[in-house]
């Protein structure tokens, strides 16, 4: 079947040119030790993307999968990579790239958990560690998870031998290609063996992603979630028009008095706004953490650890966090500022409803944002309703 001949699967709003669907992990012919790891991790039944994407990746096809955070995509490529590598070969065989250090570490954690019973090593090739540590880890790790800059540096320094690489996986490709990594990613492609299988995962399909597909992928299997399904199911979306910027803070504190949730993430567009909001909330006796890209790495790690453990109730962030960090307890996301980039909206609100967990997203807007809100609705074919007065019922 040609890549242009798409079969639409109505039951889950997925379009694909690959007609095999495997509904159970037991039917995927997975390595017995890997299967133990899959069930041990808590995966009982494959998600829609896993039912359709794991097998073509295992079969060695180039695969282009469009799926947002929370669909099980990390499990998809992790399971497939673990099935494809040879544990007896103590050298890198699969390279996974992610746009941020945090997401790379999250992926490493998932791969290690799934491969717990296998004799494999997973190395995180990321900033904030020494090149000596990298050289040591890269020597005998079968799977390398990293950020583009650090991976490229290590290949250039000849510390990362890519001769045995047979899989190149790009997660959140739209984000990586739009944030200055494009040149490095292209150069990494040219350094890998020409037979390398390419797996590309992206929430959206902008021109940059399609260019990579055309240049570096051979007749890819395409598994595309229809765009109007990309607004995460199970997320209730609302807006509050506070009219002017100065009224956002009072609205936030009023809201928080009215609802009882375990934890919340609040997104702002700038570091300065994050710092100001953190100071005001702290002064008003709210337990708050904040994170942004300029923070020292050790501090960022500590803050994320505290938030995951539940010792901090509110996390205020820039879009650094808007991609793929799995914080299980979050049921509320507040966009203190509407994102400047439409694509980031889905990653922000996805924080509250991963894998079918329910969540609420509340967008604060001023009068000038009304048009931008309507454009978001149009972009995602969704409805963002005015927040009702009885908001406490949203969390019951």
Swiss-Prot record:
A motif (Q motif) lies at residues 23-51. InterPro entries: DEAD/DEAH_box_helicase_dom (IPR011545), EIF4A_DEADc (IPR044728), Helicase_ATP-bd (IPR014001), Helicase_C-like (IPR001650), P-loop_NTPase (IPR027417), RNA-helicase_DEAD-box_CS (IPR000629), RNA_helicase_DEAD_Q_motif (IPR014014). Residues 54-223 form the Helicase ATP-binding domain. It comes from the Eukaryota. Keywords: ATP-binding, Cytoplasm, Helicase, Hydrolase, Initiation factor, Nucleotide-binding, Protein biosynthesis, RNA-binding. A motif (DEAD box) lies at residues 171-174. Pfam families: DEAD (PF00270), Helicase_C (PF00271). It is found in: Cytoplasm. GO terms for molecular function: ATP binding; ATP hydrolysis activity; RNA binding; RNA helicase activity; translation initiation factor activity. Its EC number is 3.6.4.13. It catalyses: ATP + H2O = ADP + phosphate + H(+). ATP binds at residues 67-74. Gene3D superfamilies: P-loop containing nucleotide triphosphate hydrolases. Its main location: cytoplasm. Residues 234-395 form the Helicase C-terminal domain. GO terms for cellular component: cytosol; fungal biofilm matrix. Belongs to the DEAD box helicase family. eIF4A subfamily. The Q motif is unique to and characteristic of the DEAD box family of RNA helicases and controls ATP binding and hydrolysis. Component of the eIF4F complex, which composition varies with external and internal environmental conditions. It is composed of at least eIF4A, eIF4E and eIF4G. PANTHER family: ATP-DEPENDENT RNA HELICASE DBP3. ATP-dependent RNA helicase which is a subunit of the eIF4F complex involved in cap recognition and is required for mRNA binding to ribosome. In the current model of translation initiation, eIF4A unwinds RNA secondary structures in the 5'-UTR of mRNAs which is necessary to allow efficient binding of the small ribosomal subunit, and subsequent scanning for the initiator codon. This is ATP-dependent RNA helicase eIF4A. It comes from Candida glabrata (strain ATCC 2001 / BCRC 20586 / JCM 3761 / NBRC 0622 / NRRL Y-65 / CBS 138).
């Amino acid at each position: 079947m040609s890549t242009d001949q798409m079969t639409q699967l109505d039951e889950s709003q997925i379009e694909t040119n690959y007609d095999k669907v495997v509904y159970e992990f037991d039917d995927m012919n997975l390595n017995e030790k890997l299967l133990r790891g899959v069930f041990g991790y808590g995966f009982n039944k494959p998600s829609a993307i896993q039912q359709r994407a794991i097998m073509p990746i295992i079969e060695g096809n180039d695969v282009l999968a469009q799926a947002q955070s929370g669909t099980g995509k990390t499990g998809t490529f992790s399971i497939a990579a673990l099935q494809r590598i040879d544990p007896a070969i103590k050298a890198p065989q699969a390279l996974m790239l992610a746009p941020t250090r945090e997401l790379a570490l999250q992926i490493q954690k998932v791969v290690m958990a799934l491969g717990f019973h296998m004799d494999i090593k997973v190395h995180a090739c990321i900033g904030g560690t020494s090149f000596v540590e990298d050289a040591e880890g890269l020597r005998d790790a079968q799977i390398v998870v990293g950020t583009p800059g650090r991976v490229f540096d290590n290949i250039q320094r000849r510390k990362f031998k890519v001769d045995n690489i047979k899989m190149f996986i790009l997660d959140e490709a739209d984000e990586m290609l739009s944030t200055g990594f494009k040149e490095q990613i292209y150069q990494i492609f040219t350094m890998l063996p020409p037979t390398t299988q390419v797996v590309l995962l992206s929430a959206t399909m902008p021109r940059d992603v399609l260019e990579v597909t055309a240049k570096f992928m051979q007749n890819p299997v395409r598994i595309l979630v229809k765009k109007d399904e990309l607004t995460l199911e199970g997320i209730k979306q609302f807006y509050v028009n506070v009219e002017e910027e100065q009224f956002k803070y009072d609205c936030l504190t009023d809201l928080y008095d009215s609802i009882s949730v375990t934890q919340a993430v609040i997104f702002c567009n700038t570091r300065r706004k994050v710092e100001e909001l953190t100071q005001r909330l702290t002064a008003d006796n709210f337990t708050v953490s904040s994170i942004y890209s300029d923070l020292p790495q050790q501090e960022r790690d500590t803050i994320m650890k505290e938030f995951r453990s539940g010792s901090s109730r509110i996390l205020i962030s820039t879009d650094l966090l808007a991609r793929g960090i799995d914080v299980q307890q979050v049921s509320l996301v507040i966009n203190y500022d509407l994102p400047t980039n439409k694509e980031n909206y889905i990653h922000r609100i996805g924080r509250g409803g991963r894998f079918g967990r329910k969540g609420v997203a509340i967008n604060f807007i001023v009068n000038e944002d009304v048009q931008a809100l309507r454009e978001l609705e149009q972009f995602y074919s969704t409805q963002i309703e005015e927040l009702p007065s009885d908001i406490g019922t949203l969390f019951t």
